[in-house]
Amino acid sequence: MLSCHELVLDSAANRVTARGQPINLRGVEYRLLEFFMSHSGRTFNRHQLLDHVWGDDSEVDERTVDVNVQRLRRILAESGHQEYIQTVRGYGYRFSAPNVARAE
């Protein structure tokens, strides 16, 4: 389980909640959020995100990362957490949330 403030990702249940309310994510959005939360504060370029989230052998282009990050931002904005995913101009993206906690 990963949490920051009131955003909780429960990997055992494949569920994300914000302020106790469920957030509906598609598979890739869930994996992207899980990866970002697991590596909070680190910056990743599109190619790295493709490798880690979609897999080394995926045949999607880097624009797919942008589309899915925007979609995830929009979903998180509905619960007041859009500021966590930051664009690092000329490089990629970073999940920047204070105190991401990991619990079993």
Feature roles, as predicted:
Residues 2, 8, 78-80:
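Generic detector of short alpha-helix boundary/capping microenvironments
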Residues 81-104:
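A short linear beta-strand->loop->alpha-helix hinge motif most characteristic
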Residues 1-3, 103-104:
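Basic, amphipathic DNA-recognition helix from helix-turn-helix-like DNA-binding domains
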Residues 8, 22, 99-101:
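Residues that cap or initiate secondary-structure elements
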Residues 4, 9-11, 95-97:
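Conserved catalytic Walker-motif region of ABC-type ATPase nucleotide-binding domains
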Residues 13-15, 20-68, 74-83, 89:
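Positively charged, aromatic-enriched patches within helix-turn-helix-type DNA-binding elements
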